[in-house]
Amino acid sequence: MFTTTPDPHDIDEGALEVHAPKTAAAGVKAVAVALERGMAQAGVARTVRGMLRINQRDGFDCPGCAWPESITGKRKPAEFCENGAKAIAEESTVRTVTPEFWAAHPIAELEGRSEFWLGSRGRITEPVVVRPGETHYSPISWGEAFELIGEHLRATTPERCVFYTSGRTANETAFLYQLFARSLGTNNLPDCSNMCHESSGFALNPTIGVGKGTVSLEDIHRSELVLVVGQNPGTNHPRMLSALVECRKNGGKVVAVNPLPEAGLMAFKDPQALGGIAGGGEKVADEFLQIKVGGDLALFQALGHLLLAREEREPGSVVDRHFVEAQTAGFAEYREARRALDWAETERATGLSRAQMETVAEMMVASKATIVCWALGLTQQRHSVDTLKEIVNLLLVQGNFGRPGAGACPVRGHSNVQGDRTMGIWEKPTEAFIAALEAEFGIPFPREHGYESVETQHALEAGEVDVFVSMGGNFLSAASDTEHTRAGLKRTGLTVHVSTKPNLSHVAHGRTSLILPTLGRTDVDDKHAGGRQFVTIEDSMSVVHRSQGRLRPVSEHLLAEPVIVARMAEAALGEDHPVDWRAMAEDYDLIRDHIARVIPGFEDYNRRVRTRDGFVLPSPPRDTRTFATDIGKARFTVSPLEYLTPPAGHLILQTLRSHDQYNTTIYGLDDRYRGISKARKVVLANPEDLAALGFADRELVDVISVFNGDERRAEAFRLVGYPTARGCAAAYYPEANVLVHKDLVARESNTPGYKALTVRFERRQ
């Protein structure tokens, strides 16, 4: 039970409790937990004010996931989920981290704390600094902090500076931030999308001409078939469950594909409906395929084989011939590649039976409007890009683009991670984008590609980064190969963290380090000559809308993110720089005016975003059934079969979230749906696998990963028998990120292979 004062004790891993997994998500318990966390963190009045404004048209966008709100119908009074409420509680908390906290806790002590303990201390109230040789952070004025940043940036060269971005950064901040980095002379703009959905962009851009999804929320409601693959919506996007249930009520079918039988894939107890309060909830998945980790490519190739075999037997029954002939290229090669299939190998790769795959293929044949949704279970494998291209193949075969209820749906994890990329947070900017920036601001910008996240890790470790700036986020805990990343960050001359709460990146600091406290989504932003400001967000379905904080900040010393970026830029580039940084920081309309002239789709930005529901960005595949690829058509592709085969004595491990966390932010210690509580250093593995390997349930082990002859070790994890797919295991991140070698990445996208670890266990002595 939380109290209004944070618990002084850290996690006791020996207190682990294990209960039977749940078979339904949400319900009354979710409401109770949401209210409990909010009131304990922020008090009754502040919690109620916040919850009434979450995801409402006159409120603020939830800082959690990127799931959209309806733009066609009435919104529910509670337009948020349990984990959204936890995110708001974390941000609107009245707990504070004051100078007294930093004075009482040396950095060496904080380095040994967990993310849960650090985050639960509260909101940082004023800027702090640690200088070479010092053991504690101590207060610094804003003016001195910006002067220090300017000195370090001017003392080095642009290619030795890195500007990292978290996915919850709003559009206005993101645009200003990339403009700052490029004005300085670098495209070193890694962001969290490099570590999650980068594979989606690398698969979608060359095949359909856009790196985003092609469906709306209403499309899911009216789809005839939705495949939910490599995704746990009950924890990561709980409001998606309402959409899936609505789809089924309208006659659609849902297929879930996942290595773990997650509660949210089975049933949903809608707490705003009578059935969710008194009954067993609504069924979510009509079919559940418990696939092996990494077996999805084999599954989609098998489905392609089955669809084309049906078309060959019954011409016209499957393939949208007019669409394929007029709007695509490469179909003949794809058809030939899928003509033959080794069923024994396919069953071995997937862990599924042929009959299961044939059932799903029949559902696809019967559907005239199919959507495939996916998340990180598909994007963080060595062969992720090929897997996602195979999904595109399946959608193209039946013409499932540009029609109601059909399309591709990569479900983004973090609110505005998609918007950040749209705003130019990308290490590989297009010539068109750079040319538009130059035309707008009248100064030259660099063309040479910069570092993405994994390349940043390599540069840090090589001592090639002098200044590392983090706009939100927690790079140390989000990145792979934790110990190597920690060592790399400590080699920098200056680390700068724009943050709301303490995290472990703050204590893996450069020789000099600054923590700059900022306003959050919930906070009123009104310290401007131009009056109260709002920001804008792009959700997972390309809807751009406004977000305006409504709660009083916990400290008068906090600055808004655009103000922080502008003042860093002035300190580094001088007040006589051609870009009027200060004016944009005072009036965000000016930032949006620049965006409107630089980025296609944002014309008349300030007017359109002030309308009732904002506006939807253009998507040629969705809007006009056209594809802006280099050949002007959608592209079928052919990929070889690939899957994960662990050596004897090993399992394939994936990292995942608990139900009580969001990315690297740990809300609590209750993974309620999986029945794991009070501890986090656990490995979930099939009981039959544990027995075959000679281990017992609850045994304490070290976990060793193997990649290219290198080993990584995670110490003192508890084995828990769990109904995972055979040959597979799972552990929470960030604790398990230490096992992910930085060179274990997806081909093309360079996304870390968090879902592709070959591991073995060693008993603790």
Short names for language-model regions:
Residues 2-30, 122-415, 423, 438-622, ...:
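Cofactor-pocket helix-loop regions in the catalytic cores of large enzyme subunits
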Residues 1-65:
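Intrinsically disordered, low-structural-confidence terminal and linker regions
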Residues 88-136, 146:
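Low-complexity, highly charged intrinsically disordered N-terminal segments
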Residues 113, 117-131, 654-682:
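Glycine-rich loop/turn
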Residues 71-72:
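Short, non-ligating residues that shape and space the ligands of small metal-coordination modules
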Residues 583-672:
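Long, low-complexity segments enriched in small/aliphatic residues
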Residues 723-736:
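Short, solvent-exposed secondary-structure boundary/capping segments
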Residues 748-765:
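Long, low-complexity intrinsically disordered regions
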